[in-house]
């Protein structure tokens, strides 16, 4: 059964498992999320729930969005996301989705926005080899060949070059839930997940598990 929740990355730490081995974990504050809208096949052409997460000041929300929340009879949320689930009928507008929908040992996929690195060269961005660093060499960290000469007389699309790195949507598959702490809305995930601390993430049960 598909399930999903929105959360906020708090940072990384390490805990000991039952065999006293150190396990690196990422701590995520997941939920509580509020169901703001239900989409149906008859009205929208597909089934999904729209979920809100995070507090936001009223003056930062525009009038159309404020009306959307008022119509649902729920509080304002910083983030709105849609999830296509198989059991949409089991959810009601205003219902809260909490971290206890996941259990320890479960496999999940985590989607977030990777850390932005700004403008980076080809070595850092694409892991290219650098040139000789010895005296007399005039080629150190440059791109090198960008393609052929008079034919085709152009550089092909997708040629690896320097440019903006990071700050893109990224998903890590098949991570393991180590522990959930429902009273604090925390979920401990084995390993690292995309994005900086305080970055928003979406946690779904794994599509490959």
Curated annotation (Swiss-Prot):
It holds the Pfam family Ribosomal_L3. GO terms for cellular component: cytosolic large ribosomal subunit. Keywords: Ribonucleoprotein, Ribosomal protein, RNA-binding, rRNA-binding. SUPFAM superfamilies: Translation proteins. InterPro entries: Ribosomal_uL3 (IPR000597), Ribosomal_uL3_bac/org-type (IPR019927), Ribosomal_uL3_CS (IPR019926), Transl_B-barrel_sf (IPR009000). GO terms for biological process: translation. The keyword Ribosomal protein applies. One of its GO terms (molecular function) is structural constituent of ribosome. One of the primary rRNA binding proteins, it binds directly near the 3'-end of the 23S rRNA, where it nucleates assembly of the 50S subunit. Belongs to the universal ribosomal protein uL3 family. NCBIfam families: L3_bact. Part of the 50S ribosomal subunit. Forms a cluster with proteins L14 and L19. This is Large ribosomal subunit protein uL3. It comes from Clostridium tetani (strain Massachusetts / E88).
